[in-house]
Amino acid sequence: MNGSTVHVWFSLPSDESGYPPQDREPVDAEPVEGGFRLLRSPVYASGVALGDVVATQRRGDAEWATRVVSDAGNWCARVVPFRPLDAAFVESRLAAFECTMWTTRIGLVVLEVSSSAPTDPLLEELISGREENVWDFDLGVAPDSEVLRQYARG
């Protein structure tokens, strides 16, 4: 991290199965008026994505996110490839879409999607991959999409 980049920490509640595997997550951010702008989307924390500005509360030496001050309008997804497939498979299959991808140490692929990028084609591909049983995914921030509404209705 450089001098103007800080970690903003997010508390992570666990679900009944114990997911996520940690209780907090640091996300790189830069100070801006009114809070900190996220420089990447989180791996586990929901409700925030790249570019969002969050308010924080200082505890000890750390800044802890308390709320979203400004929503950048971006959305994010986390994709888990099923073995024997891996992150390279996910990245290859989704390379044609307008998104930025990065892979975690444990093989999750995080997709960051700008508010100006076409939403439905990428969502259709994510859903297809789930239905083909090659991956599962969740949305850290869900876009407004007719594809999602139809999928939720079954």
Residue spans of the language-model regions?
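Extended boundary segments
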Residues: 1-21
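Short amphipathic alpha-helix segments
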Residues: 9-16, 48-50, 55, 80-98, ...
